[in-house]
Design a protein with these regions (language model features):
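Conserved "HGTGT" condensation-loop signature of ketosynthase/thiolase-family condensing enzymes
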Residues: 1-109, 113-155
Length: 155
């Protein structure tokens, strides 16, 4: 069996965007769940509670060309991965493109907006709102794909 070594940590979470903040808030048993007024418009939804990710800013190198095929799920995955690579001292390391490093990233689904666009297409029999990037943003493996492309990971 091959070994996997975790050498860096990165996060964009409701508890914070760096490990020291996240760890401190976990130790404090900080509750970040809140009432989400944006969910008030959903008839039959019996909860309004959630823990949204705190606002975050992307560095300048996350330009339109780099992010145009990414939804929010992928952007967050790429940025969290970048923070982990920085923490590990591996950002820009030749290992990334050596074929010896892979990606395992679970996001369950792609971006909800893109899923909604496809749902609209199915329900209303129109491709209005569908672009060349909508499927890429919707696919469940969107974050893993975009992490690989963004950092040139070939393994």
């Amino acid at each position: 069996m091959k070994r996997v070594v975790i050498t860096g940590v990165g996060a964009l979470s409701p508890l914070g965007h760096d490990w020291s903040t996240v760890r401190a808030r976990l130790k404090e048993e900080r509750n970040v769940v809140q009432y989400l007024t944006a969910w008030d418009g959903y008839e039959g939804l019996n909860t309004r509670m959630g823990a949204p990710v705190a606002p975050f800013e992307l560095p300048a190198h996350y330009n339109r060309k780099a992010t145009r095929s990414m939804g929010r799920v992928a952007v967050m995955g790429v940025r969290a991965s970048e923070l982990a690579l920085i923490d590990a001292g591996l950002l820009g390391d030749p290992l990334l493109s050596s074929g010896r490093l892979g990606i395992s990233y679970g996001s369950s689904v792609g971006s909800p907006a893109a899923i909604g666009d496809f749902g609209n297409m199915i329900s209303h029999k129109t491709t209005e709102g569908i672009t060349a990037n909508t499927y890429i943003k919707m696919m469940s493996h969107t974050a893993a794909v975009d992490i690989g492309v963004f950092f040139g990971i070939t393994g």
